Curated annotation (Swiss-Prot):
Comp. bias regions, Low complexity: 203-216
InterPro entries: Ankyrin_rpt, Ankyrin_rpt-contain_sf
Secretion signal span: 1-17
Protein name per Swiss-Prot or TrEMBL: Ankyrin repeat domain-containing protein SOWAHA
Biological source species: Homo sapiens
Gene, per the UniProt record: SOWAHA
Length: 549
């Protein structure tokens, strides 16, 4: 009796009028988390076996009076312009004696009207549609004397927008052959139950446990749930664990945001698929639900709101890379445009200015934004990690690179996602001053070259290979010059008549006296061999020297 009283109190608090009033009190729009936190205690009160039925009924109430709209990644429950008419209250949520009250024969056929003799089978009609073991609830309660009237099941067919069938059409549909009444394959436990048993097909109100076998035969009376409804049933255990079975710490703002959005997507099933940001949060579910897990800062979700006209015009004009009066006017009206990024490349307006080499655009952007109180990040990175200084060096705009470093204070040690600094994108013909300004480590210990390109610094500023080639070429030219002078001197000596004094001058050595050639004792001297007559056939070919006197 205590559980029944609690269920009745919960039913009185959870109604379509209560949901409608709650939305109207909050201006017609409320977060899903606030809506669930308001009605969750009432849904959890009472018999635990009827919790699923109360939750389904609550979702039907919300669908009747509101829709879901997603703003900036957060789903809001927004009041409908024309709410749907409420359905009659179920018998399990009312007093125990309400099941015995007669109802009109032409009333809407609902699984909770148990007045007619054929009403108890209708109460249990859509139960086989649910997957077995979905919520861990028994098919029929065994401890309540009310029988079918006290069963807390809620058919998912109630959520369909099809008009209800009259009692006459329902009676005709129950007499159709079983070819149209095949149960869905999602109920394997009921596949063996017979579909034709005339004696048990029409039990009275007192027969509470007789006709469980006739559930598949009654399925064609209701419309088959849509695929979205079946997906909702499959995903419902996750929401049940979050709401009731596994209490988790509710103090974390990140966890509250995740639970609120997942409850809207899984529990109510009122909106489309979740965003990529929410899928990333779902993959971290065990870490977020654990009270001992360390909270990680989440990346800001991408904006789902389309661009305003001024933002679109700003992105289009800044991509041209030229400073115009239109850009100046847009920046004066909205100072936040200076930090607006292109959604494809991640470029800001300063990136486009550096890429095109327009120093005036870069200066005006920074100065106007600073005067407006919104300083520009000179070292902002694009999606590839490029800063404006990287782009200026990559496209060979030396003036823009010097302006970014000297005037705007850009950092030269920032690396992109490839690990490269700005000097590594300089072209081969870049100046020495720019390389030194960007911190090229290959220029350490060198001096700046002269204005004419010569001097001692010109040799040191070159690469080692070029230095070696220069030294080799200069040495070779000097050696060839000395050799040429020597040859000219010999030609001059041959042209002159050799006098005794001049011969002595040429033969005399200024350094030291000439050493005599040592002659080995065992071998004859060359002079002796040359004086001997040549025997054989070579006697006429090799001349012999005249004998010395």
């Amino acid at each position: 009796m205590a559980l029944a009283a609690a269920a009745a109190a919960a039913a009185a608090g959870v109604s379509q009028a209560a949901v409608l009033g709650f939305l109207q009190e909050h201006g017609g729009k409320v977060r899903n988390s606030e809506l669930l936190s308001r009605f969750k205690p009432l849904l959890d009160a009472g018999d635990p076996r009827g919790r699923a039925a109360r939750r389904d009924r609550f979702k039907q109430f919300v669908n009747n009076v509101a829709v879901v709209k997603e703003l900036d990644g957060v789903k809001f429950v927004v009041l409908r312009k024309k709410p749907r008419p409420p359905e009659p209250e179920p018998a399990p949520f009312g007093p125990p004696g309400a099941a015995a009250q007669p109802s009109k024969p032409t009333s809407t056929v609902l699984p909770r009207s148990a007045s007619a003799p054929g009403a108890p089978p209708l109460v249990r009609v859509p139960r086989p549609v649910e997957p077995p073991g979905d919520l861990g609830l028994p098919t029929e309660p065994q401890d309540t004397p009310g029988g079918p009237a006290s069963e807390p099941a809620q058919p998912p067919g109630e959520r369909s927008a099809d008009p209800p069938l009259p009692a006459l059409e329902l009676a005709q549909a129950t007499e159709r052959p079983s070819a149209d009444a095949a149960p869905p394959p999602r109920a394997p436990s009921e596949a063996a139950s017979p579909c034709s048993d005339p004696p048990d097909a029409e039990p009275g109100p007192g027969a509470a446990k007789g006709p469980p076998q006739q559930k598949p035969c009654m399925l064609p009376v209701r419309c088959v749930p849509a695929p979205a409804t079946l997906r909702l049933r499959a995903e419902e255990p996750g929401l049940r664990r979050q709401l009731s079975e596994e209490p988790s710490p509710r103090s974390s703002p990140l966890l509250l945001r995740r639970l609120s959005v997942e409850e809207s997507g899984l529990g109510l099933g009122l909106g489309p698929g979740r965003s990529p940001h929410l899928r990333r949060l779902s993959r971290a579910g065990p870490r977020l639900l654990s009270p001992d897990a360390e909270e990680l800062p989440a990346a800001p979700p991408p904006s789902a709101v389309p661009l305003e006209p001024s933002e679109h015009e700003w992105l289009v004009r800044t991509a041209g890379g030229r400073w115009t009066h239109q850009l100046h006017g847009l920046l004066l009206r909205d100072r936040g445009l200076a930090a607006k990024r292109d959604f494809m490349s991640g470029f800001t307006a300063l990136h486009w200015a550096a890429k095109s080499g327009d120093g005036e655009m870069a200066l005006q952007l920074v100065e106007v934004a600073r005067r407006s109180g919104a300083p520009v990040d000179v070292n902002a990175r694009s999606h590839g990690g490029y800063t404006p200084l990287h782009l200026a060096a990559l496209h060979g705009h030396e003036d823009a690179a010097v302006l970014l470093v000297v005037r705007l204070g850009a950092q030269v040690h920032v690396r992109d996602h490839s690990g490269r600094r700005a000097y590594q994108y300089l072209r081969p013909g870049s100046s020495y001053a720019l390389r030194r300004l960007l911190g090229d480590p290959g220029l350490r210990g060198t001096t700046e070259p002269d204005a004419t390109g010569g001097g001692s610094g010109s040799l040191a500023a070159r690469r080692p290979v070029q230095v070696a080639a220069t030294i080799l070429s200069s040495t070779t030219s000097a050696f060839l010059g000395v050799l040429a002078d020597d040859l000219m001197l010999q030609d001059l000596a041959r042209g002159l008549k050799k006098s005794s004094s001049f011969s002595k001058f040429l033969s005399a050595s200024p350094m030291a006296p000439r050493k005599k050639t040592k002659i080995r004792g065992g071998l004859p001297a060359f002079s002796e061999i040359s004086r001997r007559p040549t025997p054989g056939p070579l006697a006429g070919l090799v001349p012999s020297l005249p004998p010395t006197t």
